Amino acid sequence: MNWSLQLRSFILCWALLLLSPTGLAQYTATRDNCCILDERFGSYCPTTCGISDFLNSYQTDVDTDLQTLENILQRAENRTTEAKELIKAIQVYYNPDQPPKPGMIEGATQKSKKMVEEILKYEALLLTHESSIRYLQDIYTSNKQKITNLKQKVAQLEAQCQEPCKDSVRIHDTTGKDCQDIANKGAKESGLYFIRPLKATQQFLVYCEIDGSGNGWTVLQKRLDGSVDFKKNWIQYKEGFGHLSPTGTTEFWLGNEKIHLISMQSTIPYALRIQLKDWSGRTSTADYAMFRVGPESDKYRLTYAYFIGGDAGDAFDGYDFGDDPSDKFFTSHNGMHFSTWDNDNDKFEGNCAEQDGSGWWMNKCHAGHLNGVYYQGGTYSKSSTPNGYDNGIIWATWKTRWYSMKETTMKIIPFNRLSIGDGQQHHMGGSKQVSVEHEVDVEYP
């Protein structure tokens, strides 16, 4: 008989003893001790039935407590059984009277070490995988955000495509034969305008630089950031390349044919201004009188009357680099034909335009070269060029031939407007005349 059954039997016997006549016989009922009303017995004195009712009211709680005790005893019995089974298992594998087998402890120790090593290895592997998972999660989150941004951009573009096409570049309505003509007609804002020189068959777009004094400069060339490659062929230099912008903040070459049509159209000669900026932000200019570019039949020959002035110096007149006594003569530009890599018209036995990677009025080869290779930072060297020649954006009378300009501008204006509100004082009497050996006088129909 288990303990739960013994306990239940004990409690039942005790209850029967209370209910038996023997137990009740010891109780002598008197009025003093019996007829005292007690809510536990109802409205009756504690007769046998009253006590029975009283005990019955507690029977449910007693049964519950008994069941709880039985459950506890059952769990204890189960644990005891499990402990006995475990002891039996230990006794099977361990006999205190039997000495351990040779190497048993060492083998168990080695197995334990190996297990520990395996556990550590898997822990390290898990850490590595966790790190990789976090990295991939970061990439996923980043890509998800990028995809969201791209979807938004696509939605914006789709919405934009639903609208009628609009020209986002502002082109002014005023037209004329050059930018000064446009300024004379009342234009006061720099920007893009259409002009039609006298002998042009159709109008074309130019950038006009108009100042507060009413001067209208027609811009022929701009270098700003190296965004445009100036290594172009003859046709590209003829027609022009790059980008014209309303703010004048893009690189371009207007085109030799357009420059020819503008510069040759008027009885009033044009002045050419060259503006330079180095990588320290310093600026300088060089002005030339009676600037003209001939027709294609004459290889777009450059001519001018004389150097007016400017702190950049007269590089168009050549420069003595000290390499040869004839340096100055063979690096002058007045009267030179235009050359490109595929149309060589220079005085050099080789091809200046090809070795310098540009198009320009080459002699043998140059002292001023504004269409050269754009070198970030300005300074470059012979070893950094493909052929060992100075091929940067140079102006030898202001900087060395191994210093490439940061920004350049070539622009023209009618000569009689040059000194009006310009801020630069050029005196004709002090102007430097071109020497006889460089002077060129060419008539074009």
Swiss-Prot record:
Keywords: Blood coagulation, Calcium, Coiled coil, Disulfide bond, Glycoprotein, Hemostasis, Isopeptide bond, Metal-binding, Phosphoprotein, Secreted, Signal. GO terms for cellular component: blood microparticle; cell cortex; cell surface; collagen-containing extracellular matrix; external side of plasma membrane; extracellular space; fibrinogen complex; platelet alpha granule. Residues 400-422 are annotated as: Gamma-chain polymerization, binding amino end of another fibrin alpha chain. Residues 1-25 form the signal peptide. Ca(2+) binds at residues 344, 346, 350. There is a cross-link at residue 424 (Isoglutamyl lysine isopeptide (Gln-Lys) (interchain with K-432)). Its main location: secreted. SUPFAM superfamilies: Fibrinogen C-terminal domain-like, Fibrinogen coiled-coil and central regions. The modification Phosphoserine is found at residue 431. Residues 424-445 are annotated as: Disordered. Residues 170-416 form the Fibrinogen C-terminal domain. Residues 435-445 have a biased composition (Basic and acidic residues). This is Fibrinogen gamma chain. It comes from Rattus norvegicus.
